[in-house]
Amino acid sequence: MASIIKRKKNYSVIYNYVDENGETKQKWETWGTHKEALKRKAEIENQQHTGTFLPPSNQKISDFLYDFVSLYGEKKWGVSMYDSQNSLINNYINPIIGDMEVQAVTPRVVDGYIQTLQKTASVSTKTRKATTTYVSNQTIEKIIKLLRCAFKQAVRWEIIGRNPFDNVVLPKTEYKKRDIWDAEMIRTALDKCIDSKLYVAMNLSFACSLRMGEILGLTWDNVHISEDEIAADNAYVYIDKELTRASKRAIETLGEKDIYHIFTPLLPNTSTRIILKKPKTDSSIRKVWLPKTLAYILCEWKKAQDEIRNFLGDEYQDYNLV
C-alpha cells in the first residue's frame, strides 16, 4: 500500500518495498500536484498487487553501462565492435547522461538527450578524425541503437519496467550518394598508377568488389591461380580474413578468439595493434572468381614477391599476405 502526505506546495507518495538484500525500506517520491500523486499511488499499488513492482534503484547510467559491457558486450561483440561501442559510451553517453539514474530515463528524457547530441561537438580519436562539427545523425542513430540494446538488458535484469529507447523518433538522416567510377575512370586510374602494390590492390578492389580490410587481409593460401585453374576459368580468391586495427584493451578483454595474427607494432607503447581476424559476419566469408587478366597480374606479383623473399632470406618478414 502507498499513502500521500502534503508537504508545503508538493505531495509525497510514501510506500515500503523490499530491496535486493531482502530488507524493507521506505521510499518518498515528491510530485507537484495531488492528481499526479494519486496517479503514482495507484500505479504503485497496482504493480505491487500484480507482482510487477520494481524496487527503486539509484544506479547511475555510467555504472549500468559498465555492467552491460562486462556482462553482455564481452560475450556478444568482436574486437572492432567492442572498440566502437566503448568509444560511443566514453565520448557521447557518459559525459552527457552518465550521472543520471537509469530509472529516471523516460521517452521525454531521451528526446532531450537527442537534442543535446545534435548540439554536441564531434570527438576525434587517436585513430579517427571527426568529419563533422557536431555529432552527425548517423552517429546519433548508432548511439540510440546501443542504448536501446543496453536498456533492453535493463528490463531483462528487472532494473526498469520498460525500455524508454523503444519507438524513439530519430533525426532524419540524409545519406549522400557515392560517386561511382565508370570503366573509363577506372582504366585511367590504373594506367596512371606507378606503385605495383597499389596497382594489385586496385585491381582486386575493382574486379572483385573487395573492401580494404579484405584486400589487406588476403593471404596467398587463399589465392587459387594455378595454370590449370586459369585455363579452365576457375581461378578465384577465398575471403575468410580481414586486416584491421584494434585496441590492446579490446584484445586483452575479449581474448584472441577469431584473431589469426597480431602484428608487432613498429613503435613501442602504442595502444592499438594491427590484427588479422575473421570477418564480422559469416556472410562475408565467400569465394570470388577472378577474371583471367587479374589472375595473371597476381601471378606476376607472386613472382616478384618470391624474388624479394629469396634475396632477403631470413630478413624477409613473411606473413603470407598478398
Predicted regions and their residues:
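Short, surface-exposed polybasic/aromatic micro-patch for ligand or macromolecular engagement
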Residues: 2-58, 279-281
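Conserved hydrophobic/aromatic pocket- or pore-lining residues that grip, position, or stack substrates
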Residues: 65, 93, 110, 147-150, ...
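Short, charged, surface-exposed hinge/linker loops at domain edges
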Residues: 54-71
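Basic, Lys/Arg- and aromatic-enriched nucleic-acid-binding interface segment
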Residues: 123-126, 130-137, 141-143, 156, ...
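Short, structural beta-strand-to-alpha-helix junction motif
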Residues: 60-64, 101, 219
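Conserved tyrosine-mediated DNA breakage-rejoining catalytic core shared by Y-recombinases
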Residues: 7-14, 184-185, 218-303
